[in-house]
């Protein structure tokens, strides 16, 4: 990539504040896709692929996604280089490296990570409880949430200076 190369970043909306905070280059544009694609990872590649096909006029495309439950499987760009981070999920991206993520994970393996974007998308534990309550009723929602979170020991808020 050169300084004059036009680059499109296609990223998850949960990373919006972090990416906007560091992008000051006029030749880099960012398009955000809805976080809800994480609930249906089978639909994620198609949504990303559609954005890639619409990316005329760019020299490079960068994905702002980790592998996200194989949500980027099969995504490709025929006309230009496609840069895909080597990351399991967005938390690794937000930590800056796999090593930094693993270092934090080793402190307490049962850690639930939250970011400003996840909270704003109401995907924090309370938001998930509300979503499940509407879907299943309160008693079943509490049981499902308890099952989902039973192995977590702590919650860590990853801020990166955007809060």
Where are these regions (language model features)?
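N-terminal basic/disordered segments at the start of proteins
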Residues: 1-25
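Gly/Ser/Thr-rich loops at beta-strand to alpha-helix junctions
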Residues: 10-17, 37-38, 62-73, 88-89, ...
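A short beta-strand-loop structural module common to alpha/beta enzyme folds
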Residues: 27-43
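Long, charge-dense
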Residues: 80-126
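Structural motif
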Residues: 8, 59-62, 154
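Short, well-structured alpha-helical segments in soluble
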Residues: 46-57
